[in-house]
Curated annotation (Swiss-Prot):
Keywords for the protein's UniProt record, in alphabetical order: Antiviral defense, Coiled coil, Cytoplasm, Golgi apparatus, Metal-binding, Nucleus, Phosphoprotein, Transferase, Ubl conjugation, Ubl conjugation pathway, Zinc, Zinc-finger
Family: Belongs to the TRIM/RBCC family.
B30.2/SPRY domain sequence ranges: 324-511
Protein name per its UniProtKB record: E3 ubiquitin-protein ligase TRIM7
Gene Ontology CC entries for this record: cytoplasm; Golgi apparatus; nucleus
Pathway given in the UniProt record: Protein modification; protein ubiquitination
Keyword rRNA-binding: no
Tissue: Skeletal muscle and placenta, at lower levels in heart, brain and pancreas. Isoform 1 is widely expressed with high level in testis, kidney and heart.
Classification via SUPFAM superfamilies: B-box zinc-binding domain, Concanavalin A-like lectins/glucanases, RING/U-box
Subunit (UniProt): Forms homodimers. Interacts with GNIP2. Interacts with GYG1. Interacts with RNF187 (via C-terminus).
Domain characteristics, as noted in the entry: The B30.2 domain mediates interaction with GYG1.
Coiled coil: 166-263
Length: 511
C-alpha cells in the first residue's frame, strides 16, 4: 500500500506562486518598486526604503544614519498619501526588513508566455510610470492637469503647484463629472418637456390655422357668391332696359310707318287732284283739302326722352360700383397687410445697471446689485428701464411680451426723448404709455390716476402700435381679448419700453 504524502500538483504550485507574488508586493517599496532595503515607516503607517524617502525629501545622505539626525523640524508630505510626516519620527521596520531578506533568498519562476497578461497589459503598466524617473504615478498636479510621480512632486517645476493623491484627484474628477451629468440630465429633461410642449403648441397652431383656412375660404366663397348675385342683378337690369328700348323702338317705328303710309297716300291724291282739269279740280279741291285737315300730325314717343334717363341711372350705378370695388380692394389689401409683426431685441446701451439682459437680448430681469457698466448718455441711470434697439415713426406694428406672474413689471412704448437721467414718473406726460402689474392688479398707466383692468391672469400680451391713427393697444394673446388702448398724437419716433423693478419677476420678448 502506497504511503499517502502531501498533495502536490499544478493547482497547489499555482496557489503558492500567487501567494509568493502577493507577499512580494507587500514587501516592495512604492518608490523604487524593489524589495525593501532598510525600510522605515512614517507616522501615517506607510513604509519606504530609507534611501528612497530621503531622495524624495531631498535630504542629502538620507541613506546614512547620521543624515536622519539632520532632518528638518517641519513636516513633509508622505510620498504615497500626502499626509504630513515629520522626518525626525522615521521608525525602522525590522519585520518588513526580515520579510524582504527572506524573499531575496527565493526567486519566483518566470511567467509563461501569456500567463500574466498580454503586451497590452505590459503597455498599460509602462504608461502608469513616470517616463523621466521610472516611478509609478501616485500624484496629480492640478496646475498642469497631469499625473506625476513622487520625485516629480519634489522637483522645482511642481514645488508651488497644487498636488493631490491620484485617487483623490480621480474622486474629485468623478464628482465633478457626476455634478455635470446631473445638470445635463436636468437640461435634457427640460428639453424633453419643451419639445413635448412645442409639439403640443404646434399641433394646436396647425389646427387653428386649418380652421382659419376654412374660415377664409368660406368668407371669400360667400363674397364671390354675393358679387355673382349683384353682377346678375345689374346685368339683368341692363338686359331689361335693352328689351324696353327695342320694344319702344319697334312701337315708334310701326306708328311712324302707318303715318308715313297715310301721308304718302294723301300726297299722291293731292298731286292727282292738282293735275286734273280746272272744273274737276275745283269740284274735288274742297274734299281733298278736308282730308288733309283730318290727318293727325306725327306724335311718336321718342326713345331718348325716357330710356336715356334709365340708361343714365344704370351708368351711374356702374360708376359708383367701380369706385366702391376699387376702395374695397385697397381697404382689404391694407387690412391684410397692416400690423406686420416686428422682431425686437433689447438695447444694452439703454439698460439700467441693475437690469440683467439675456444673451439673446430678448429677456430682462432685475439683479441684486448694479453692474459696472459704461455711463452711456442713452442709459437709464435711476429708473430700472430698457428700450428696444429699434424705434418707429410710421406704419402699423405689433409685438408680443411674455410676462412674469409676480408684481414689478411694466411695458409699452416711450417717445425717443424720454428722460434717461434721474427719477422720472411713469406717466403719459413723460412720454410713456404702458401696462403694469402692481399690487396684484393689472393697470393701464393713465394720468392723473391709473386705470385698473378687469382681466384674468396674463401670460402673454400683444402690443399693437398704429402710428397712422395714433393708438397703442394691448391684447391678451390667449384669446385676443382687448385690454386697453391709448390715444396718442405722436410727434416723434417711439420705442418699445420695458421696466422690471422686482427680483421676483421678469419680462421677455416672445418668442
Amino acid at each position: 500500500m502506497a504511503a499517502v504524502g502531501p498533495r502536490t500538483g499544478p493547482g497547489t504550485g499555482a496557489e503558492a506562486l500567487a501567494l509568493a507574488a502577493e507577499l512580494q508586493g507587500e514587501a516592495t517599496c512604492s518608490i523604487c518598486l524593489e524589495l525593501f532595503r532598510e525600510p522605515v515607516s512614517v507616522e501615517c503607517g506607510h513604509s519606504f526604503c530609507r534611501a528612497c524617502i530621503g531622495r524624495c525629501w531631498e535630504r542629502p545622505g538620507a541613506g546614512s544614519v547620521g543624515a536622519a539626525t539632520r532632518a528638518p523640524p517641519f513636516p513633509l508630505p508622505c510620498p504615497q498619501c500626502r499626509e504630513p510626516a515629520r522626518p525626525s519620527q522615521l521608525r525602522p521596520n525590522r519585520q518588513l526588513a526580515a520579510v524582504a531578506t527572506l524573499l531575496r533568498r527565493f526567486s519566483l519562476p518566470a511567467a509563461a508566455p501569456g500567463e500574466h497578461g498580454s503586451q497590452a497589459a505590459a503597455a498599460r503598466a509602462a504608461a502608469a510610470r513616470c517616463g523621466q524617473h521610472g516611478e509609478p504615478f501616485k500624484l496629480y498636479c492640478q496646475d498642469d492637469g497631469r499625473a506625476i510621480c513622487v520625485v516629480c512632486d519634489r522637483a522645482r517645476e511642481h514645488r508651488e503647484h497644487a498636488v493631490l493623491p491620484l485617487d483623490e484627484a480621480v474622486q474629485e474628477a468623478k464628482e465633478l463629472l457626476e455634478s455635470r451629468l446631473r445638470v445635463l440630465k436636468k437640461e435634457l429633461e427640460d428639453c424633453e418637456v419643451f419639445r413635448s410642449t412645442e409639439k403640443k403648441e404646434s399641433k394646436e397652431l396647425l389646427k387653428q390655422m386649418a380652421a382659419e383656412q376654412e374660415k377664409v375660404g368660406a368668407e371669400f366663397q360667400a363674397l364671390r357668391a354675393f358679387l355673382v348675385e349683384q353682377e346678375g342683378r345689374l346685368l339683368g337690369r341692363l338686359e331689361e332696359l335693352s328689351r324696353e328700348v327695342a320694344q319702344k323702338q319697334n312701337e315708334n317705328l310701326a306708328q311712324l310707318g302707318v303715318e308715313i303710309t297715310q301721308l304718302s297716300k294723301l300726297s299722291s291724291q293731292i298731286q292727282e287732284t292738282a293735275q286734273k282739269p280746272d272744273l274737276d279740280f275745283l269740284q274735288e279741291f274742297k274734299s281733298t283739302l278736308s282730308r288733309c285737315s283730318n290727318v293727325p300730325g306725327p306724335k311718336p314717343t321718342t326713345v331718348s326722352s325716357e330710356m336715356k334717363n334709365k340708361v343714365w341711372n344704370v351708368s351711374l350705378k356702374t360708376f359708383v360700383l367701380k369706385g366702391m370695388l376699387k376702395k374695397f380692394k385697397e381697404d382689404l389689401r391694407g387690412e391684410l397687410e397692416k400690423e406686420e409683426k416686428v422682431e425686437l431685441t433689447l438695447d444694452p446701451d439703454t439698460a439700467n445697471p441693475r437690469l440683467i439682459l439675456s444673451l439673446d437680448l430678448k429677456g430682462v430681469r432685475l439683479g441684486e446689485r448694479a453692474q459696472d457698466l459704461p455711463n452711456h448718455p442713452c442709459r437709464f441711470d435711476t429708473n430700472t428701464r430698457v428700450l428696444a434697439s429699434c424705434g418707429f415713426s410710421s406704419g402699423r406694428h405689433h409685438w408680443e411680451v411674455e410676462v412674469g406672474s409676480k408684481d414689478g413689471w411694466a411695458f409699452g412704448v416711450a417717445r425717443e426723448s424720454v428722460r434717461r437721467k434721474g427719477l422720472t414718473p411713469f406717466t403719459p406726460e413723460e412720454g410713456v404709455w404702458a401696462l403694469q402689474l402692481n399690487g396684484g392688479q393689472y393697470w393701464a398707466v393713465t394720468s392723473p390716476e391709473r386705470s385698473p383692468l378687469s382681466c384674468g391672469h396674463l401670460s402673454r400680451v400683444r402690443v399693437a402700435l398704429d402710428l397712422e391713427v395714433g393708438a397703442v393697444s394691448f391684447y391678451a394673446v390667449e384669446d385676443m381679448r382687448h385690454l386697453y388702448t391709448f390715444r396718442v398724437n405722436f410727434q416723434e419716433r417711439v420705442f418699445p419700453l420695458f421696466s422690471v423693478c422686482s427680483t421676483g419677476t421678469y419680462l421677455r420678448i416672445w418668442p
